[in-house]
Amino acid sequence: MIEKLISASLRNRFMVLLIAVILFGFGIFAIQNNKIDAIPDLSENQVIVFTEWQGRSPQIIEDQITYPLVTGLQGIPKVKYVRANSMFGMSFIYVIFKDHVDPYWARSRVLEKLSTVKNDLPNGVSPTLGPDGTGVGHILWYTLETNGMDLGEQRAIQDWYVKFALQNVDGVSEVASFGGFQKQYQITVDPNKLSYFKVGITDVMQAVKSNNNEAGGRKFELSDRGYIIKTSGYLKNIQEIENLPIKTNNSIPVKISDVAQVQMAGENRLGIFDYNGTGEAVGGIVVMRYGENAADVIDHVKAKMKEVAKGLPEGVKFNIVYDRSGLIKESVNSIKHTLIEEMLVVSLIVMIFLLHWRSAISIIIQIPITIAASFIILNAFDISSNIMSLTGIALAIGVIVDNGIIMSENSYKQLSIRQAELNHQKKESE
């Protein structure tokens, strides 16, 4: 088989050169379109299921949330195993699939299973899927630099403006907010006043719930004009909450302000984010989607941040605290320079030691063609250009050249033997 292949190649030299040129051209195209990252993604093929049930202990979360979900999700096909973690008010479940499984197929199967499993959960509890990213998907961290702005205001800017804008960037799976606190209206009841007015906690909660609502009406016509009726009932400030009636006592309404104190405050936090010991900060983590080019996504996010910065309040600006693009450029450029140096040194050594320019060229020309062809294979298997893959190519240069040297020396040896036989036959004929 090999002998026939070599014979066919020798008889069709132009075709061999044409195939080599085409292969090199496709290789250059593959190099330009290959994804770039600092490190390979070796994380597990997982789908995260997050469930929140505020105020419940870890044991209750384990018994009523985690256990039903884990037992239900174990029946999904192509699942290796299911891990879970229960904590105060939250449950995390990690469904680990086999490596060859498409991540979006896996997410659809988990979502399909959750539609039936959630019937076994307490009322009002709804599990959600985590972002469609990997364990190394955190590509950029940023904080908001302000001139003494309240942490609640910073978090509001992050949650209601910056986050939504950056999530629209192509390749971004999620922008996770951190730091500060989320503003909320807090109603602090006085037990003595509740007892005095004979009002229960549930009465206070129901009063707020029933009065914080809007409803639509029907359309009616008047003087040949159509009007749409709606009621406006959403609470807008502290005074409106304080004036809500709970019940009547001897024809006198008992209001929220009679039994409780209403204030604007931050939600209770389990931790804070401190930036280099300078104090608390508010920011976000940009998570990259499965299979995206990290370098391109970071560039797009930075471009979007420049647009978003124009709409920020005066004195507020972005401060990038972690940017993987610097690591990507330094690591990949370092390997590329090493690769070029190896190619030049190997080519020079081959030319010096072979002392035969035709043989040297036939060996040297294999290096760029083989490297270009290797990127075609990298793209075919969806492997990015990173430290490990480029280092492997650099180490393989010696093998590429060694193979060419052996073939050239063997060919030269066989030609010399054949030439000696021809010379011997020529002398005998004379």
Give the positions of each predicted feature.
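Cytosolic juxtamembrane regions of multi-pass inner-membrane proteins
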Residues: 299, 307, 311, 328-337, ...
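Membrane-proximal extracytoplasmic
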Residues: 1-343, 352, 358, 423-424
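Short alpha-helical scaffold segments that flank and stabilize functional sites
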Residues: 12, 109, 113, 304, ...
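Hydrophobic transmembrane alpha-helices and their membrane-interface caps
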Residues: 27-32, 37, 317, 344-412
